[in-house]
Every structure is written in structure tokens, then in C-alpha cells.
A protein has these predicted regions:
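Donor-nucleotide binding loops and adjacent catalytic segments primarily
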Residues: 194-199, 203-276
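A short, well-ordered alpha-helix in the C-terminal region of glycosyltransferases
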Residues: 344-359
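Conserved N-terminal ligand/cofactor-binding loop architecture of enzyme catalytic domains
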Residues: 22-103
Length: 395
């Protein structure tokens, strides 16, 4: 009988769904699709107004109102406030959560979204018997207290910093494990040689390639940054990914460029693009940084969401895998300096990037989940209380 694995996530940014799908696909590959019944649930979509509009509101908030986002993130990031907000989310949506659980029976529950973790854990814990609950932290370094619930059976984290925050939040060492961040299990297999990737993509074989990414929604000043690099008249080629932002793609296509320039919309061949590139210009999203590290691609971080992505910048810079350049002019100057330093310096940064990666993370996470999928159901909060009272009477 197939094991039922429920993934709790939301499309607030692309990283949560990507992580859930990566783990699901690793389970399919490792244990067979006939043996795994995986369900992805966007919990915000099932929630009451206004939370059900978070997938639409989130990109605007983090891109257009960063100061407000930073204030909210930092004010809520204490043990007490995170718990209070999680309780509020649960009680506001208790009936909807109950229906979600009844409609989607599970042998194991996997949560890949910080805001959902504690509220969902509370929803499952009111059951008489509940499935094991596993949290997979998808923020790289700076992690919110929302992520850490002491009732979860496992909390799988990407870095030592995330592990240390879990300890501070009250989790026990045996509850946590450092695995790295999950990426598509086919990612490594798609990392062909630079020459092969460029031939497949139609890029010039002998010019350094600067890959520019703004995330799936095409957020950030990508056009201005690309123009700043182009106006340097460097001996290189540009590859610019506009994501789902059609207006940005059209603007890029209508712009005259001083170098050979390749323009893309939303892509599904990121491993090939990274394999073909020499330098990546990107925002500090954890999934893209992790993929770049696995690919051995030096990174110039041009933007970061306040709060959860601040630590990502420090992590990359302190490990000498990249640089931080928050203005288009600074990005262009960094690209020029790196190209001037030559191939050996770039190769060292590439080696540093690979050193901070764990390409096996998704397999380790899938194996952990599979083990828990075979675990017996666990007593919920009320049953635990009854068992405790029974033991007290017996003694």
C-alpha cells in the first residue's frame, strides 16, 4: 500500500513549492511512484481572508514595501510572539484545518513553510492519534522562530546557523539534523560540461558568460543592472532570465546591448544555464544560491529580502563564494573586477561555492521522511494528557 505523504506549503515565492516538489520527486525516484502518494497543499489558499490572498500579496510586499516587511519580520521573530501568532492563525482557521486533515489522510506530514509550521502542528496535535510531523526548513541561515515547534518529530535544517536557532527555540538536538537545502534530484545529473551546455544553448564558446536571474516572478531592478554591466563594454556575454515577468522580457528584448545577449522568460533548464555560466547575478533566494553552490558558480548578490535573506548574503560572502552588490553600478563594477582578475580567481570562488553545498540533501531528507512514513501513529495532546493522568493514578 502506498505511503501517504502530505506536504504543507504555500506559493508565497517559488521556493516552498520547489522544495516540496524536489522532495516528492526524490521519493518517487528512490522508492517508486507506485509506493508514494504525495499531496501538496497550499495552506494559505485554504485559510480565511485575508490570509488566502498571501500568494498574491507576498511578492508586492517584499518587493515594493521592504521596510514594512522588515518591521513585521523582526517584531514577530521572538519565541513568545511567534507562538501567539501561530495560535491566532490556528484558532482563526481551526475548522478549515480540521477539514484539510480529514480530506487528506497522511502517514507523515512534511511542512516546508515557516508561517504554517506551528499552526499546522497544533491542528494535528488536537487529534486523538496523529501522523508524524516533519519540518523541512527552507530558509538558509536567518530563520524565524515560526519554523521551530517542539512537538515536531524532526526538524531538518540547511545550515549550522539554522540548527543553533532551533536549539535556542527549545528543540532538542535529537529532534534536529543538518541536511542542507533540497533541490531538484535531477539537478546534478543535468550539470553537463560548460562546453556542452553552451553548445546546446547556442552561446558563444569562448566568451565569459554572466547569468542574471531575478527569481520566478522577475522581481528586482534586473534591467537597470543588465544595462550597467553592458555599458562597461566588457568582453563577455550576458544571459538574462526575466521569469514570468512578460513586460520585463519585452523590455529586455527591445534594448540594444553592447555584448552578445541571450534573453529568456520562465525557464526549466536552470542546471544547463548554470553549467554554461561563469558568474551568477541573483537575489539572495536560498534555492537559487543552493543550486549555484552545487553548480560551483560564483555569485554576486544584488538584492535580499530583509529578515529571512540577510544571513544568506553574509553566508556567501564569508565563505568567499561571492560578493554583495546592492546597486546596479556596484554589480557592474564587481563583474568587471572579477573578469579582470582572471580565470584562476573565478575558479577559486567556484571551488568555495561547491564547498558550502550538499548535493545529496534532497536524498537525505527523502530517506528521513520515508522512515517516518512507516512509523506508527502518535498520541495527540489530549491522549498524552489522559495517559499522563493514568500513570499518575497508577503510581
Amino acid at each position: 500500500m502506498a505511503k501517504r505523504i502530505v506536504f504543507l506549503m504555500s506559493d508565497t515565492g517559488g521556493g516552498h513549492r520547489a522544495a516540496a516538489e524536489a522532495i516528492r520527486d526524490a521519493l518517487y525516484i528512490r522508492y517508486g511512484k507506485d509506493n508514494v502518494e504525495a499531496t501538496l497543499i497550499d495552506v494559505f489558499r485554504l485559510s480565511r481572508f485575508p490570509m488566502n490572498y498571501m500568494p498574491e500579496f507576498y511578492p508586492w510586499l517584499v518587493n515594493r514595501s521592504k521596510a514594512s516587511w522588515a518591521i513585521g519580520y523582526n517584531l514577530s521573530n521572538t519565541r513568545g510572539r511567534a507562538n501567539l501568532l501561530a495560535r491566532t492563525m490556528y484558532y482563526t482557521n481551526a475548522r478549515r484545518f480540521k477539514k484539510m486533515i480529514q480530506t487528506n489522510p497522511a502517514d507523515v506530514v512534511v511542512c516546508v513553510h515557516s508561517v504554517i509550521t506551528r499552526a499546522a502542528m497544533r491542528a494535528y496535535d488536537v487529534l486523538d492519534m496523529r501522523p508524524p510531523f516533519i519540518t523541512v526548513v527552507t530558509d538558509l541561515v536567518t530563520t524565524h522562530y515560526f519554523w521551530y515547534d517542539k512537538q515536531a518529530e524532526r526538524c531538518l535544517v540547511p545550515t549550522q546557523a539554522a540548527y543553533d536557532r532551533g536549539l535556542k527555540a527549545g528543540l532538542k538536538p535529537e529532534q534536529m539534523r543538518i541536511t542542507g537545502l533540497p533541490v531538484d534530484p535531477r539537478f546534478m545529473d543535468s550539470l553537463v560540461s560548460k562546453q556542452a551546455a553552451r553548445a546546446e544553448l547556442g552561446w558563444l564558446p569562448d566568451k565569459p558568460a554572466i547569468l542574471m536571474v531575478a527569481g520566478g516572478d522577475g522581481m528586482g531592478p534586473l534591467h537597470a543592472t543588465a544595462r550597467a554591466i553592458s555599458e562597461k563594454h566588457l568582453d563577455c556575454q550576458l544571459a538574462i532570465i526575466a521569469g514570468r515577468n512578460r513586460a520585463l522580457k519585452e523590455k529586455l528584448e527591445q534594448t540594444p546591448w553592447e555584448q552578445p545577449t541571450h534573453i529568456y522568460g520562465f525557464v526549466r533548464n536552470m542546471p544547463r544555464l548554470m553549467a554554461a555560466a561563469d558568474i551568477l547575478v541573483t537575489k539572495a533566494g536560498p534555492a537559487t544560491l543552493t543550486e549555484a553552490a552545487i553548480a560551483g558558480l560564483p555569485m554576486i548578490i544584488s538584492d535580499a529580502i530583509p529578515g529571512q535573506e540577510d544571513g544568506n548574503v553574509t553566508y556567501v560572502v564569508e565563505n568567499n563564494a561571492g560578493a554583495y552588490a546592492p546597486e546596479p553600478r556596484q554589480v557592474a563594477e564587481t563583474v568587471a573586477n572579477w573578469l579582470h582578475e582572471g580565470a584562476d580567481a573565478l575558479a577559486q570562488r567556484a571551488a568555495n561555492a561547491r564547498r558550502i553545498a550538499n548535493p545529496n540533501a534532497v536524498w537525505e531528507i527523502a530517506d528521513e521522511i520515508w522512515q517516518w512514513a512507516h512509523h506508527e501513529s502518535l498520541p495527540g495532546k489530549r491522549r498524552r494528557r489522559r495517559l499522563h493522568r493514568h500513570r499518575e493514578k497508577s503510581s
